[in-house]
């Protein structure tokens, strides 16, 4: 009777897809080289015959090394997966060449004897796949390469079975043998019966239980060539393999390659195959079968060339076509969002910026002072870069003029006086991406030249602001007024934080990073927003007309400035010195000004100090400015007084901007300027003037 075989069918655990997607995105990138993958199979007595021969790919299949074989009782199979970059590459891959190459690996191992070190190659497989990382679809095709026997092996007698006692003794012997050999040998082995008269008296080391009249001896496949069967009768010799098939008459797929080994290495054309289907917990069930096989006589048992190879898996409809797994149907939406947010960022590392440190950006905790137009755009850009921690501070409410310019708010947010901006901005960001850790605080930032009406509340606001600045890495100054930025500038410099600032005009903007305290003990650093001021910031809202009270700018200015500000932050985070990175120095003059990367391998380019933009002529200027020794916000006297006095200093400063001017030295600068102006004599060229009028000087 011709021998038929039960083919393997693939069974992939969901975690494997995630592991493969992650590996492709983070490690393999454009590399589509085949990489090892571990397959597992096992006898499953409870499964129907059609569902019994499963090649299982567990979640850890990509990372399991050669010493691992999965859960107890499972047999390993050696596999490779080739995950290509496009669906067209998947379609155009030469499938015949691929399975032929897999068959050659088995054939060569049989020919040179290395199969004895890794018998699990006899159950090897290949996977051709394409992972669509955007749509979470996985197109794949398994191949289980099988070498054809020609002439075919045939069953020469009835299928044999073991008794329950024989099966129990066999399972115990196999279990003992497996402890002594490599796990790759567990699926294929030799077995023989050693009769009692040959074995001598029964010892305490023999199988426990009922005396079956013989004992089982188990050996590795290589032992055949060293005389393992020499002392056993022909009817007591078995070549065995772990058989997951539950078909009564059909053994599983790995037997096909084992029969080639038997012919090539053992030079046999007649053999008893032990289809080992028993397991330790159910060893008494005696499910294993014995197949007496033989093939027609041939002139030379040994094959001269590799036989035909087949084995591509059929899909669920029985067609020789690949399968498609739509993972979006099974994955948690929040987890899908997490992976989707990181997708475009990780793709940057494939070709364009392989040295980009995405974790440095992702783990940066950002505090946004202002949840209006700038705050809305900045927060969305931070989300785009994968930032996971964002906190808003704003004391205002959403008004009807806001939603069209501030993308975090809707019309409904304006009703009944408007929702608190900071709270609503946080909720909106959470709706956009549930994985973000976002909070909002309706907090009034104490401002210079604004009277303190409730000292307890103002101090509480100051304490909360200090707590938030201390617990974040990057501070964004995005408020409407100049004086509202003074205290956060001072506190950010004192805490040695990254301080980012954006300010808007009608068609102009400035985007800058504040200089951090130097690491080398020197006083020179980059300037802050206030370093160009010659007077201390005052109440800019006093006696203002409506067009001066509102932020009147061209609508696109805020989006441009916000994008540049976030891009500047990411460039800072890629620099080895972070906020202490020096500003680039220009080379060349005029229209030929250029800048060199520092360091040269910076993945994003320059880390400028300031970018000033002019929408009227669509130009940007990169500017570098030193800190001003008499700055009202970041000079040494101001910093020292704040560090020493804390709230008491702030209270005094808020109440009297003259105090800040005197302490910083700005007042003295003004006095010296006035004195110089008073002493300066203005003269005009006397040529051509009417001397009779006597007007030669003007004081």
UniProtKB/Swiss-Prot annotation:
Annotated spans, Disordered: 680-699
Keyword Secreted found: no
Superkingdom per UniProt: Eukaryota
GO terms, biological process: autophagosome assembly; cellular response to nitrogen starvation; mitophagy; piecemeal microautophagy of the nucleus; protein modification by small protein conjugation; protein transport
A cellular component annotation (GO) from this entry: phagophore assembly site
Record carries keyword DNA-binding: no
Any one Gene Ontology molecular-function term assigned to this protein's record: Atg8 activating enzyme activity
InterPro entries in UniProt: Atg7, Atg7_N, Atg7_N_1, Atg7_N_2, ThiF/MoeB/HesA, ThiF_NAD_FAD-bd, Ubiquitin-activating_enz
Compositionally biased region (Acidic residues): 682-699
Sequence motif: GXGXXG motif, positions: 370-375
Subcellular location, principal: cytoplasm
Coiled-coil regions listed in the entry: none
Active site: 550
UniProt keyword annotations, A-Z: Autophagy, Cytoplasm, Protein transport, Transport, Ubl conjugation pathway
CDD domains: Apg7
Cellular compartment(s): Cytoplasm; Preautophagosomal structure
Record-stated family: Belongs to the ATG7 family.
PANTHER family on file: UBIQUITIN-ACTIVATING ENZYME E1, UBIQUITIN-LIKE MODIFIER-ACTIVATING ENZYME ATG7
Subunit structure, as described in the record: Homodimer.
Domain comment (free text): The GxGxxG motif is important for the function, possibly through binding with ATP.
Role this protein plays: E1-like activating enzyme involved in the 2 ubiquitin-like systems required for cytoplasm to vacuole transport (Cvt) and autophagy. Activates atg12 for its conjugation with apg-4/atg5 and apg-6/atg8 for its conjugation with phosphatidylethanolamine. Both systems are needed for the apg-6/atg8 association to Cvt vesicles and autophagosomes membranes. Autophagy is essential for maintenance of amino acid levels and protein synthesis under nitrogen starvation.
Identification of the protein by name: Ubiquitin-like modifier-activating enzyme atg7
Chain's gene name: apg-5
